Amino acid sequence: MIIEIENLIKKFSIGGGLFTALNDISLIIKKGEFSGLVGPSGSGKTTLLNIIGGLDSPTSGNVKVLDKMINETSHDERALIRKKYMGFIFQSYNLLPVYSVYENVELPLILNKIEKNKRRDKVLNAIESVG
């Protein structure tokens, strides 16, 4: 499994009470699968992504990323996992209008110092996979 979430709950303290942002979320994302998270504003999408990425902690439940309990990893390990294995596209994403689609997809690979000959295949495969 790439991502495995079991019985995830996230509550926030608000005005002397508790607000439940995520209630008993369980899901599995396997290698090779693509997933999208869609919902109205305030439904918990960003909260869930922040927990998966190790940027926030759950109130209860388990979150495994690459067979590691994300809340048991160090700050540096979580940063490496996010850098190498995760991509987040939030509601207000934008492509850079001065670049082609190819160049927009290639840009993160350039920033991560991926060799040019490897970038081409990765970019073309990514573009082909989404049509």
Q: Where do the language-model regions lie?
A:
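Short coil-to-helix segment of the ABC ATPase nucleotide-binding domain corresponding to the Q-loop/switch region
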Residues: 99-108
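The feature captures the beta-strand-to-loop junction immediately N-terminal to the Walker
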Residues: 38-40
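Conserved ABC transporter NBD signature motif
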Residues: 61-72
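ABC ATPase NBD coupling module
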Residues: 19, 70-87
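Helix-to-loop junction immediately C-terminal to a conserved catalytic motif
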Residues: 53
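Conserved ABC ATPase "signature" region
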Residues: 68-69, 110-113, 117-131
